[in-house]
């Protein structure tokens, strides 16, 4: 079965987006899949606004371990976060910046609590570049202006979801993996979502939703 058929039990694309927005408003996570012809992976996504140590611990335990903080381009500029490399030649042009750590309130920076502290420090609307040490254990990503209508990536999907939910435009993501370390695909992602009460949606769902409601996001 293809992705669309497997996801049909979660409703149509508009319903899937609305369920995800409700979950985020309630402080729960969602699972966002990209296209089967792209990465064909699913990311756990939480809002920074509601992020807890327990949620971070779940991400570290169940995912790849590379926890990323998705920020608007404007906020990343405010924090003076340069690209991780000068010449980004990755296949999907993922916009990693230098990694970060909070200067205050952390120990080694790698624990769930420390990563939450770093993330909330960086995403604070009044944050300054000097609040952060570089490098660190959190990996910021710059969302392209225009969101999923400009780039159909998990980074843009994360920031768009937060804005659509009326939350602070910052979220965390990490790629869901199987117990054997392989990447989770649609059937495993759906099973995980049911187990952890996380709605499942796709980036294509979000594109359809934004186009239907003509949402102009940053």
Swiss-Prot record:
Cofactor binding mode and count: Binds 2 divalent metal cations per subunit. Magnesium or manganese.
Protein's UniProt keywords contain Metal-binding: yes
Residues the entry annotates as binding D-ribulose 5-phosphate: 38-39, 43, 151-155, 175
Domain of life: Bacteria
Entries under Gene3D superfamilies matching the protein: DHBP synthase (3.90.870.10)
Pfam families attached to this UniProt entry: DHBP_synthase
Residues that coordinate or bind Mg(2+) 1: 39
Catalytic activity from the UniProt record: D-ribulose 5-phosphate = (2S)-2-hydroxy-3-oxobutyl phosphate + formate + H(+)
InterPro entries in alphabetical order: DHBP_synth_RibB-like_a/b_dom, DHBP_synthase_RibB
Enzyme class: lyase
Reported cofactor(s): Mg(2+); Mn(2+)
Coiled coil residues, start to end: none
Pathways involved: Cofactor biosynthesis; riboflavin biosynthesis; 2-hydroxy-3-oxobutyl phosphate from D-ribulose 5-phosphate: step 1/1
List of residues binding Mg(2+) 2: 39, 154
Entry keywords, A to Z: Lyase, Magnesium, Manganese, Metal-binding, Riboflavin biosynthesis
GO terms assigned for molecular function: 3,4-dihydroxy-2-butanone-4-phosphate synthase activity; magnesium ion binding; manganese ion binding
Annotated EC: 4.1.99.12
Single GO BP term: riboflavin biosynthetic process
GO cellular component, one term: cytosol
Function: Catalyzes the conversion of D-ribulose 5-phosphate to formate and 3,4-dihydroxy-2-butanone 4-phosphate.
Family under the similarity heading: Belongs to the DHBP synthase family.
Subunit structure: Homodimer.
Protein name per Swiss-Prot or TrEMBL: 3,4-dihydroxy-2-butanone 4-phosphate synthase
Lineage: Bacteria, Pseudomonadati, Pseudomonadota, Gammaproteobacteria, Vibrionales
